[in-house]
Amino acid sequence: MEAYQNAALSPEERAKDLLGKMTLQEKVGQLNQRLYGFRIYERQGEEFTLTEEFKEEVERMGGLGVLYGLYRADPWADKDEKTGIVLELSAKAYNIVQKYVIDHSRLGIPMMMSTECPHGHQALGGGLLPVNLAAGATFDPELLSEGYKACGKQLKSGHVDLALMSASIWRATRDGEEVRSANSEEPVPCRIHG
C-alpha cells in the first residue's frame, strides 16, 4: 500500500506522498473542471454509456479533478426524464463514472463532483427553493434552514462535493438580474439571514 492510500497517516502526510508521485499533467488534471457532466453519458432505459469525449478527457488529463453538472437536466443541458439521470439512477450513474475515473487514473485518484445549486439541487427530482431574493423576503431563517438542510441531504446522497451557489449581496438596482442572487438588496433581510 502506498503512503497516500494509508488512512492511518495524517492528511498532510498522505497529500505530500501523493503530490510527490504525480506528474505535472496529473496535477493540472486535478485542477480541471471544464468538462460538462451532462455530456459524458448516453442513457438508454436504466443503462448508461460513457461518451468518447469523457474517455478522451480522462486519458488526456491523467484522471479528472472535478466533474461539473452530471445530474443537470434542463433545456441547456438537453436532458430530461428519459435522457437524464433520475434520482433512482443517480447512484448507479455516479458509480459508473467514478469507477472509470479511478480505473483510468495511474494513481487511482477519484474525482470530485460539482453542481449548480443557486436555490436547490438542479437535478431531476431535486428540491428547489425560491430564488434567494424571494427567500430573503420570508424573514424566516428557520424555515429556510430546513429547506437548505433538505437540499444538502439531496446533494450528499448524490455524492456532490461542491455546490455552486450565489451569495453576493448587491445594493445597486442597476445590477438587475444579479440582485436576485442575494437574499435582498436591503440590509434588514441580509442581517436576519446572515
Model-inferred region functions:
Residues M1-G194:
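Glycoside hydrolase catalytic-domain context in secreted enzymes
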